[in-house]
């Protein structure tokens, strides 16, 4: 079972075929890696069924769900799903709920007028249900009348909020048991996020996502991942704008393009993700642990064969 040390695992890419989840889960479990994170992006594979598949074929592995869109299910059903998963593998579930991509929510006719309010109401309701309470609430988005789970978890897992911005982080600090921070979640971003949440890492479960690329030749890893970093810079989310060298990085990319990213200082790459040599990867995850992170999910290559080979890298990082 998981220890007090930061746990490291693999993120199951949304494009992977669902039958691959049991193979990768078993490989991680045998190797001693701590976690597998399943991703629910619309309209790819579903998080709950992937999590159930992974939990039932493993003995020690924690499985995180990162994340379920808050308004895609009734919160009573979400709580039932989480309670059932915890019953299948007590103590090995890390459930996450987030805003969801709003354009996807609109496609389903489920886009809320206030993503922040809807997420807060869902987190509170699901948390109360998992705690075994009889819940009656009539909010803007959650309407429950005397709902109580028949089999709530004996020890409810921390309910994690998949959030990014200051207002959402502050809300998560009030009502959630932790956060899932999307990639590239480096140590500077983690410290900023904890500050926004108004929480300390000793009582708030911080999970981060990153991308993994370990090569013997550091520059080769940079060449492989430069297009990914370019996309991150184009999106300019708080995960990248929070890094202390963001202005210099953005200017470098604007002036020199991908070549400028490949040749940027190695320590910038190490801040952003486990990209470079294995020593660089160790340095990155150690910095995350010092920043207060408890769980790290790493995206492998979307190429299945390459991803299979990267399981060994994740096992090595987990055994550090």
Describe the residue ranges of each PLM region.
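Hydrophobic faces of well-ordered beta-strands that scaffold small-molecule active sites
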Residues: 6-12, 36-38, 63-66, 93-97, ...
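Alpha-helix-loop-beta-strand connector modules within alpha/beta enzyme cores
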Residues: 45-68, 72, 121-125, 129, ...
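Short, acidic/polar
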Residues: 16-28, 81, 162-174, 225, ...
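Active-site-adjacent beta->alpha loops and helix N-cap segments on the catalytic face
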Residues: 44-53, 183-199, 304-309
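N-terminal beta1-alpha1-beta2 module of alpha/beta enzyme domains
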Residues: 1-66, 157, 304
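Active-site mouth loops of central-metabolism enzymes
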Residues: 6-19, 68-75, 153-163, 212-215, ...
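An alpha-helical appendage that flanks or caps ligand/catalytic pockets
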Residues: 2, 112-148, 190-290
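Conserved, mostly hydrophobic/aromatic
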Residues: 32, 54, 85, 126, ...
């Amino acid at each position: 079972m998981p220890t007090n040390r930061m746990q490291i695992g693999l993120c199951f890419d949304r494009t992977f075929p669902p039958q691959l989840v049991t193979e990768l889960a078993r490989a991680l479990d045998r190797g001693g890696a701590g976690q597998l994170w399943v991703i629910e992006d619309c309209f790819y594979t579903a998080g709950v069924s992937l999590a159930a598949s992974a939990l039932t074929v493993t003995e020690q592995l924690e499985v995180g769900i990162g994340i379920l869109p808050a308004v895609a299910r009734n919160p009573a059903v979400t709580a039932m799903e989480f309670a059932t998963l915890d019953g299948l593998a007590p103590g090995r579930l890390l459930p996450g709920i987030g805003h969801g991509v709003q354009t996807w929510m609109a496609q389903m006719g489920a886009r809320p007028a206030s993503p922040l309010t809807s997420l807060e109401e869902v987190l509170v309701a699901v948390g109360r249900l998992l705690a075994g309470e009889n819940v009656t609430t009539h909010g803007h988005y959650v309407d429950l009348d005397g709902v109580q789970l028949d089999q709530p978890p004996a020890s409810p897992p921390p309910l994690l909020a998949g959030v990014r911005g200051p207002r959402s982080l502050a809300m998560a600090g009030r009502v959630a048991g932790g956060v899932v921070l999307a990639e590239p979640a480096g140590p500077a971003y983690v410290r900023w996020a904890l500050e926004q949440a108004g929480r300390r890492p000793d009582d708030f479960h911080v999970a981060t996502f990153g991308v993994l690329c370990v090569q013997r030749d550091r520059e080769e890893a940079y060449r492989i991942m430069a297009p990914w970093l370019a996309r991150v810079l184009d999106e300019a989310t708080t995960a990248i704008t929070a890094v202390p060298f963001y202005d210099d990085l953005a200017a470098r990319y604007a002036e020199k393009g991908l070549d400028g990213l490949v040749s940027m200082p190695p320590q910038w790459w190490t801040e952003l993700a486990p990209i470079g040599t294995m020593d660089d990867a160790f340095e990155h995850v150690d910095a995350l642990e010092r920043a207060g992170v408890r769980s790290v999910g790493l995206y492998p290559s979307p190429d299945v064969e390459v991803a299979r080979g990267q399981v060994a890298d994740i096992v090595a990082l987990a055994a550090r």
